[in-house]
Amino acid sequence: MKTLLTHHLSQSEIMQLCALTQGEHNDNLKEELYQLTLDADRRVAVNALWVFTHFVADDNVWLFAKHDQLIDRCLKERDTTKLRLILTMLLRQPFEEEAVRTDFIDFCLARLTDARAPYAIRAQCIKLAYEQMRHWPELLDELRQTLEMISCEPLSPGLRSAWRHVMKKILSCNVY
């Protein structure tokens, strides 16, 4: 499988790799693909992550068991492309109240306020912060205040959209 990931992948090649790993009977291939996300060859690792972002919902469930590992990787990742792809994978996962990690909440809050961070990562962190903090009114209030703070700076259209979407959800919670 590694040789398939060593070059630029087309959309049809991504779909072929998704089909190859589809279904529970191919969980061993999903694990092989996941291990390739850790490969020393950046192209291989990025392509493997990219394939996971295209998994259908049923196959994406397999990644739920990797939830904490993916969060740990976010906390350490310095490559913005890999980080963006891992955050995309996490956006497709549930954040249960009893399993929320404060270190990841802190990570998301720090990234969404970092004007030097890429817009896509900031937008993803806005969404992920909400998914984690929505269980507690006091944390939602903290997120609302943080979002109000960044609203004064120039935001890209994508970042502004994420901001508006999450603010609408926060305000609809009727805690204010």
Model-derived features: positions:
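Alpha-helical scaffold domains
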Residues: M1-Y176
